[in-house]
Amino acid sequence: LAILSFGTIAKVISDTLEHIKNTKAVAHYDMCFVKPLDRELLHSIFKRFKAIMVFEEGVNSGGAGSAILEFAALERYHIPIKLEGIPDQFVSHGKTSLIHQELGWDTHGISKKISLLLNRTK
């Protein structure tokens, strides 16, 4: 499983990976920018992993996750891609850590999401 992160969520993901078992099956890539996408890196990730999970601190629709889906479609990669972005609905304002918790993006929530996807792609 490759986890691609866009934004400050990268720190939470790194912290989470330090505390979960089977981290050899998971690699985290902090994708520092969306435009332009690092196509060379994406090709190597898509060839190496059986599933991709994209975390972004933007709305799913039209964001980094959409760009990853478009890349996969254009390059004809056929592996599961799970998007974890902000739903296209009102999200209350507040401290980032509280919003992350509300979205299930705290250490516990991310760990569960990783485990679920790993179990589905065995």
Locations of regions flagged by a protein language model:
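Thiamine diphosphate
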Residues: 1-122
